[in-house]
């Protein structure tokens, strides 16, 4: 993908590759506003940026450290996900578990929409630190736990209305099935709850006995599971 000169300038300023004088700061913020206004997301190739879509912090931009090993859910897929959730729950009265939380992208969206009880789990220390810092700054009720997702499920005793998992897209299919099994065998989902797994659209989980349906958006799929 060819990057226009103005985008190269933005990236150079953002990454401090050119002197950051007063006029440079003006250009930096002007270009940033231009990119977001017209949805030109070239710099998203270089920085892990997020946008809170709705709720108390609607439209707020968050930029995570670029060295975090994550792949944030896209705005389009995230908006579609929460449209689904709004048909099932009052988000201001549910208990949520966010597995493979990464930058905390999904947890922040729940927090902005008034969810009172959110647990975010990730095994990467940098991700855990970033989520804790951001949740504190935004005053979101997010408990952040550093743990492997499977270990957490094996040891946890609580149940949740929504369990969302966004594992790496290259996670073997048998591990995706294991994740579903742990949730239901250990009764970690409330009776009317939903388990949602984000995964590559190349994978189908419809043979799982707890599978309800899936939604596909480009290369992303959300598989929904419930108590049957």
Please place each PLM-identified region on the residue numbering.
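N-terminal amphipathic/hydrophobic targeting modules at extreme N-termini
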Residues: 10-19, 23, 41
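Residue-level detector of transmembrane insertion/anchoring sites
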Residues: 5, 13, 22-23, 68, ...
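Short hydrophobic targeting helices and cationic amphipathic motifs
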Residues: 6, 11, 34-37
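Class I S-adenosyl-L-methionine-dependent methyltransferase catalytic core
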Residues: 26, 31-228
């Amino acid at each position: 993908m060819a990057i226009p000169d103005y985008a190269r300038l933005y990236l150079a300023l953002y990454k401090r590759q050119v002197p950051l004088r007063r006029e440079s700061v003006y250009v930096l913020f002007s270009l940033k506003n231009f990119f977001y206004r017209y949805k030109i997301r070239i710099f998203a190739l270089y920085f892990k940026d997020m946008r809170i879509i709705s709720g108390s912090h609607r439209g707020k931009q968050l930029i995570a450290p670029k060295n975090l090993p994550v792949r944030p859910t896209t705005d389009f897929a995230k908006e579609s996900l929460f449209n689904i959730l709004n048909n099932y729950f009052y988000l201001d009265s549910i208990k949520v578990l966010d597995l493979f939380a990464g930058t905390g992208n999904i947890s922040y969206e729940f927090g902005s929409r008034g969810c009172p009880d959110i647990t975010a789990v990730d095994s990467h220390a940098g991700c855990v630190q970033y989520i804790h810092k951001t949740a504190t700054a935004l005053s979101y009720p997010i408990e952040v736990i550093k743990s492997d997702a499977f270990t957490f499920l094996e040891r946890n005793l609580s149940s949740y209305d929504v369990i969302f998992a966004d594992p790496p897209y290259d996670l073997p299919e048998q591990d995706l099935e294991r994740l579903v099994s742990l949730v239901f065998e250990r009764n970690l989902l409330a009776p009317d709850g939903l388990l949602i797994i984000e995964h590559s659209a190349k994978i189908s989980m419809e043979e799982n006995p707890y599978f309800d349906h899936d939604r596909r958006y480009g290369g992303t799929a959300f598989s929904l599971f419930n108590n049957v």
